[in-house]
Design a protein with these regions (language model features):
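Short, small-residue-biased leader/transition segments that mark boundaries at the very start
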Residues: 1-12
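Class I SAM-dependent methyltransferase "Motif I" SAM/SAH-binding loop
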Residues: 45-49
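Conserved SAM/SAH-binding beta-strand->alpha-helix loop
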Residues: 70
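S-adenosyl-L-methionine
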Residues: 79-112
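A short glycine-rich, Lys/Arg-flanked "PGG" loop and its adjoining helix->strand segment in the class I
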Residues: 137-151
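Conserved beta-strand signature within the Rossmann-like core of class I S-adenosyl-L-methionine
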Residues: 152-159
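Class I S-adenosyl-L-methionine
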Residues: 170, 175-222
């Protein structure tokens, strides 16, 4: 992939959109997109990229970074993005695939990089006790997310796993986040902003209820 030091302010259609040198992008994330005046969203644990690709196509006026630690997943994600965009004749100029360890996510964004929204969709539940701290909704992660969200920015969390969801609700409360919307059966509600991926459809067809919440981080004291 191309060295991102060479990213122009506006991205040409042939420029690579896969990033694995995230540390070098701190303070320069806007430069990775064709139009850095758009809102910036971040999906954590993007897997095969289906959600992020759908989002980028449906909302061309929003930039989205789709992050995962697994290179093999992101390789599938690249094909997903390319195929979905090619099918409608669009250039993928509002999506970046990012390979990172999300444990250190807050170290990769500067003040001018803050994001408007974070998505966490169907992440590994890590339900065995000693592994709970690996959860993307664990309090130590929520502490980082509040530092990279803009004022008024929100986090949206979706899962099919009951234990992860109930524990996460407690995590958000413990960390002072305000839960603004919550449902334990998303598909039974009229929620127009929901993008349904193949993953989510599969769970629903198996009879699993999809749990969802939106939350705002605690207001920082001045």
């Amino acid at each position: 992939h191309r060295d991102l030091h060479s990213f122009p302010t506006r991205r040409s259609s042939d420029l690579d959109y896969y990033v694995d040198n995230a540390e070098e992008m701190k303070g320069k994330w806007g430069e990775a997109f064709a139009d850095n005046s758009r809102p910036l969203y971040l999906e954590l644990g993007c897997g095969k990229g289906g959600f992020a690709a759908q989002h980028a196509l449906k909302y061309p006026d929003i930039n989205i970074i789709a992050a995962d630690i697994k290179a093999d997943m992101l390789a599938v994600g690249r094909r997903t993005v390319e195929n979905m965009f090619a099918a409608v004749g669009r250039t993928h100029d509002n999506i970046i695939l990012l390979r990172i360890n999300i444990v250190n996510i807050s170290q990769l964004f500067a003040e001018n990089d803050k994001v408007d929204r974070i998505y966490i969709n169907f992440c590994n539940p890590w339900n065995r006790g000693k592994h709970n701290k690996r959860r993307l909704t664990h309090p130590r992660q929520l502490e980082q997310y509040k530092n990279i969200l803009k004022t008024g920015g929100e986090l949206r969390f979706k899962t099919d796993d009951d234990e992860l969801f109930e524990d996460s609700v407690e995590y958000f409360k413990e960390c002072g986040w305000e839960i603004t919307y919550i449902t334990r059966d998303l598909h039974s509600e009229d929620f127009p902003d929901n993008l349904v991926t193949e993953h989510e459809r599969m769970f629903a067809e198996e009879g699993k209820k999809i749990k969802y919440l939106s939350a705002l981080p605690p207001v920082k004291s001045k």
